[in-house]
Amino acid sequence: MPPSRLRLLPLLLPLLWLLVLAPGRPASGLSTCKTIDMELVKRKRIEAIRGQILSKLRLASPPSQGDVPPGPLPEAVLALYNSTRDRVAGESAEPEPEPEPDYYAKEVTRVLMVDNSHNIYKSIETVAHSIYMFFNTSELREAVPDPLLLSRAELRMQRLKLNVEQHVELYQKYSNNSWRYLSNQLLTPSDTPEWLSFDVTGVVRQWLSQGEELEGFRFSAHCSCDSKDNTLRVEINGIGPKRRGDLAAIHGMNRPFLLLMATPLERAQHLHSSRHRRGLDTNYCFSSTEKNCCVRQLYIDFRKDLGWKWIHEPKGYHANFCLGPCPYIWSLDTQYSKVLALYNQHNPGASAAPCCVPQALEPLPIVYYVGRKAKVEQLSNMIVRSCKCS
């Protein structure tokens, strides 16, 4: 370029900037986050989910359906799936990023309480203020071979009809037949059964590391200093007098259990190689006509959209996705233009403006078959609940 033109360049640049962008005007038009056709976005999201599910399950391709037994799912599998689904539904999405190990699917296992007929219960004095629940640690270790693989453990029990309000406490069996306090709940009167849940992740990790053959919990009425009657008024399904016939089987299936979520051994070695990070939420975005960054609805039918028949529950789910511009104010009286120029110099392929990305995500429990065996797993970060500009 001739020297005379070089001398004019500093004078022309301010005029060019004024033509392109007036002071205080949103600079969203300069974003390299391209506007994409909605249908194209949905198709790309569906294909991404196809790969995401297979990746989380460590499957190179969808399982064969040739050996799947006909008929409905086994009752035990369906009960485990329902328990997992109910737990997820009861939790709100966390806005913080999940730790690296939470990227891969967790294998969900239900370990039932040792039956009431076991001798361990006969060795404990029967009292009106407490009931006891013991578990076989060999069953726990079979489900989770390494304590470090355990992501979460919950003690779940079904409370039957309750006529009076009662404060209850949970204790862990400790050394020398003593009991260590864990947590408490205030139960209100109800005519319908209700599932109670206690987080016992730390306790189960201890049992997996150095527990005895049988370990247990004590579920007690709160011992109030000013009350003479500390009787436990709560009746727990599966604990109590033996039933006969079909009722005995139902009674046994409904007894308290531990719900374990753990990373399978075959996936543990891959934890270091992948990361997945997780506002504008569904309550706002689904009820407004917001054009900027927001959660957009997307329902995926496993059979229709992915051509999959190997996932038995659920039939589909609301995956959702984030879409919309992220405008910002760019004034000529700021230093932002200098920063942006330097940023683009070092990151020529990056966006010049913030992009709309997921902020909070929730897991998806599924039931699928591997050969003739039905499995329940929880896939993390599958449902977009809120978005942000980043």
Curated annotation (Swiss-Prot):
A motif (Cell attachment site) lies at residues 244-246. Glycans are attached at residues 82, 136, 176. Residues 1-29 form the signal peptide. It comes from the Eukaryota. It holds the Pfam family TGF_beta. Residues 30-74 are annotated as: Straightjacket domain. Keywords: Cleavage on pair of basic residues, Disulfide bond, Extracellular matrix, Glycoprotein, Growth factor, Mitogen, Secreted, Signal. The keyword Acetylation does not apply. Residues 75-271 are annotated as: Arm domain. The record marks 278-279 as: Cleavage. Transforming growth factor beta-1 proprotein: Precursor of the Latency-associated peptide (LAP) and Transforming growth factor beta-1 (TGF-beta-1) chains, which constitute the regulatory and active subunit of TGF-beta-1, respectively. Belongs to the TGF-beta family. Homodimer; disulfide-linked. Interacts with the serine proteases, HTRA1 and HTRA3: the interaction with either inhibits TGFB1-mediated signaling and the HTRA protease activity is required for this inhibition. May interact with THSD4; this interaction may lead to sequestration by FBN1 microfibril assembly and attenuation of TGFB signaling. Interacts with CD109, DPT and ASPN. Interacts with EFEMP2. Interacts with TSKU; the interaction contributes to regulation of the hair cycle. Interacts with TGFBR3. PANTHER family: TGF-BETA FAMILY, TRANSFORMING GROWTH FACTOR BETA-1 PROPROTEIN. This is Transforming growth factor beta-1 proprotein. It comes from Cavia porcellus. The lineage of its organism: Eukaryota, Metazoa, Chordata, Craniata, Vertebrata. The gene is TGFB1.
